[in-house]
């Protein structure tokens, strides 16, 4: 009986751990892979409700899932192969300087962050502005709120 209970607890823990990881694929440490990431943010990490950039943590809260069409528009991914992404709300002050004294959004506070994880790659787009970004190709092409896109790898 004790072995059966132990197996049940072990199976429950495994299912819980794998479902939590599947719900937050961005969680963990990511190395800068694009030129923008290497020159502005450096490596980043996600842990629960925080993003850490250049050894400074900022609170973020998930708002909604991004559809494959929105991921395609934001990160130039093929719609038929893109998965879901995530839109986060946060506040990274414009006064916060990162690598080489760079900021994320110039003189604007960073308010929004879209992410997309594919295999061992993480793509992040930072946005300023009071309203959530409209994640369509047309809106993003003319957006003054899109601060930049970054690529990271594990």
Residue ranges and their predicted role:
Residues 1-3:
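N-terminal secretory signal peptides that target proteins for export/translocation
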Residues 6-17:
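Bacterial N-terminal signal peptides
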Residues 18-24:
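Sec/Tat signal peptide C-region and signal peptidase I cleavage site
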Residues 25-27, 31-64, 98-113:
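Short, solvent-exposed loop/hinge segments that bridge or flank secondary-structure elements
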Residues 41-85, 123-135, 140-154:
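N-terminal glycine/threonine-rich, aromatic-flanked beta-hairpin/loop signature
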Residues 66-111:
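Mid-chain, structured segments of secreted extracytoplasmic proteins
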Residues 118-120:
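Residue-level recognition of beta-strand termini and adjacent short loop/turns
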């Amino acid at each position: 009986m004790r072995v059966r209970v132990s197996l049940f607890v072990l199976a429950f823990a495994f299912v819980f751990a794998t479902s939590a990881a599947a719900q937050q694929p961005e969680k963990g440490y990511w190395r800068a892979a694009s030129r923008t990431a290497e020159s502005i943010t450096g490596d980043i990490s996600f842990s629960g409700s925080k993003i850490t950039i250049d050894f400074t943590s900022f609170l973020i809260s998930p708002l909604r899932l991004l559809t494959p069409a929105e991921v395609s528009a934001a990160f130039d991914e093929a719609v038929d192969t893109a998965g879901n992404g995530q839109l986060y709300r946060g506040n990274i002050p414009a006064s916060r300087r990162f690598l080489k004294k760079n900021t994320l959004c110039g003189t604007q506070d960073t308010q929004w962050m879209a992410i997309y994880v594919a295999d061992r790659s993480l793509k992040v787009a930072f946005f300023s502005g009071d309203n959530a970004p409209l994640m369509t190709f047309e809106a993003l092409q003319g957006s003054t709120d899109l601060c930049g896109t970054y690529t990271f790898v594990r």
